[in-house]
A protein has these predicted regions:
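Acidic-basic catalytic patches of nuclease active cores, encompassing PD-(D/E)XK
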Residues: 1-73, 79
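Surface-exposed cleft-lining segments at the edges of enzyme active sites
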Residues: 43, 89-97
Length: 128
């Protein structure tokens, strides 16, 4: 099973999860990312970032409630309405070998937060 090796929160995000009522959604996200069997296949190109990315995308689709934007924006978003207020969490999954794509993911999240479509952004990256 995959595990979360580290979490880094910026600009009060950890407190924002509680204040906006997104903690449960955060916990659901962590479960989605870790509660499945990730098998290592002894074949060339079987365990690359693209294969792992497909596994994560399949998990988001299976769980349901997550909206996917395949290109040009945040990969996955989920929103709740709490006491009449809509709050949203956005996820970028970065498993590409190209490190320059990470800044593009940061830009996507920043744009969505700045424009008021997201309240919290998350980037998922491999630990090693």
């Amino acid at each position: 099973m995959p595990k979360i090796a580290d979490r880094t929160f910026f600009n009060g995000t950890n407190q924002k999860l509680d204040r906006l009522g997104l903690r449960k959604l955060w916990e659901d996200l962590e479960a989605l990312l870790t509660s499945f069997e990730l098998l290592v296949v002894e074949a060339r190109n079987s365990n690359g970032g693209a294969a792992v990315r497909v596994m994560f995308d399949d998990r988001f689709r299976t769980v349901g409630g997550w909206e996917n934007r395949p290109t040009g924006g945040v990969n996955w978003t989920k929103c709740y309405t709490i006491n009449g207020t809509r709050v949203c969490l956005g996820i970028e999954i970065q498993f590409s070998a190209r490190s320059d794509l990470l800044i593009v993911d940061v830009q996507h999240l920043r744009d969505e937060i700045t424009e008021g479509r997201l309240d919290v952004g998350v980037i998922v990256v491999p630990s090693k």
